[in-house]
Amino acid sequence: MRAASQGRYTGPQAESRYVIPRFVERTSQGVREYDPYAKLFEERVIFLGVQIDDASANDVMAQLLCLESMDPDRDISVYINSPGGSFTALTAIYDTMQYVKPDVQTVCMGQAASAAAVLLAAGTPGKRMALPNARVLIHQPYSETGRGQVSDLEIAANEILRMRSQLEEMLAKHSTTPVEKIREDIERDKILTAEDALSYGLIDQIITTRKMDNSSLR
């Protein structure tokens, strides 16, 4: 791979992933090398583009807390293209989003499925968005345990019922849909277009361009 200093791409090798380019930017302090994620972070944008597990949840929480400490009065944007994941990792990010002082704008690009759908809806009211061809998928949580003695399985069954009830309450809190309707809908996968998600109350608007009044994001 050829060097970035010669105007060419460098980045990690991966068979199933487009190689992330790195670029050099000259500043008054000298030369700095960036990747797109670092540049987005400087603009107070967190990109959640992976499955939600403990590792990715820790990354997102760390960025939320760091951006709050840097400026507690400026909005944080979370761009989402995720298939979802662990319920416990979801609740960790969710609680942190509610905990930090800045408003959290959420934008669905591609898909916000399962746990990611809850994070999309959990953004600051009025600042939850989706691109026109995005989709949102909601369903009941899956068991994160399933082996052991009969007594252990009973504990796991009770826990998944608790998680389901908690998920229903989260979705009802951050949407305009009654909890009874949500309880019925998540029996199986419920796939929503951007327009459907807007009607459901999971987002506040569908956007086609980033050209908007930046003062609303402060």
UniProtKB/Swiss-Prot annotation:
Gene3D superfamilies named in the record: 2-enoyl-CoA Hydratase, Chain A, domain 1
Residues in the signal sequence: none
Keywords: Cytoplasm, Hydrolase, Protease, Serine protease
Positions annotated as active site in the UniProt record: S114 (nucleophile), H139
Catalytic activity from the UniProt record: Hydrolysis of proteins to small peptides in the presence of ATP and magnesium. alpha-casein is the usual test substrate. In the absence of ATP, only oligopeptides shorter than five residues are hydrolyzed (such as succinyl-Leu-Tyr-|-NHMec, and Leu-Tyr-Leu-|-Tyr-Trp, in which cleavage of the -Tyr-|-Leu- and -Tyr-|-Trp bonds also occurs)
Main function: Cleaves peptides in various proteins in a process that requires ATP hydrolysis. Has a chymotrypsin-like activity. Plays a major role in the degradation of misfolded proteins. Probably partially responsible for degradation of ECF sigma factor SigR prime.
Family: Belongs to the peptidase S14 family.
HAMAP family (alphabetical): ClpP (MF_00444)
This protein's name: ATP-dependent Clp protease proteolytic subunit 2
Organism expressing this protein natively: Streptomyces coelicolor (strain ATCC BAA-471 / A3(2) / M145)
The encoding gene: clpP2
